[in-house]
Amino acid sequence: MFNKIFCPIDGSETSSHCLTEAIKIAKAHRSRLMILHIVDDFYPFLDGLEIANLAEIEKELRKNGEKLLKKAAERASSEGIKTESKLVEVLSKKIPTVLLEEADKWGADLIIIGTHGRRGINHLMLGSNTENLIRISSIPVLTIRHKQ
């Protein structure tokens, strides 16, 4: 039923659990899996830091994102899943918009995402990025709540 499953991850426990579920579903449907990590515009949180430090921080965020993707892709591949991974840098667009654009571009027929990520104040039931993705997506979205 699902040929291409798109799973964004952010390094949180919720996204790790989400990846586990995406792997299970991909195995059951013999689907391909795209794992995506976003390095986003974090400048509002860095008020007062020197510009020289920003380049180092960006470099470290990319490096950490690449490590996260490599580990996630190895995890999925070890389960026999055909896996692709992608690191995307977001500077001006909203994360849900970028997620949907990337899922569309790849031809995903299911998006699997955690209910809450690493940043921001949690809304009542869903994280803001997940909630907004659900609102704008033409692709079915399966939300995974963190196992507690």
Tell where the protein language model's regions lie, with residue ranges.
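Small/aliphatic-rich secondary-structure junction motif
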Residues: 3-52, 75-77, 84
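Aromatic/hydrophobic pocket-lining residues that form π-stacking "cages" and hydrophobic walls in ligand
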Residues: 22, 72, 99, 133
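A short acidic, glycine-rich active-site loop
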Residues: 53-67
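Gly/Ser-rich helix-loop-strand patches that form or flank binding pockets
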Residues: 24, 104-148
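Structural beta-alpha unit
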Residues: 74-111
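Short, well-ordered secondary-structure micro-motifs
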Residues: 18, 45-47, 96-98, 123-125
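Short glycine/serine/threonine/alanine-rich loop segments
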Residues: 31-32, 81, 108, 139
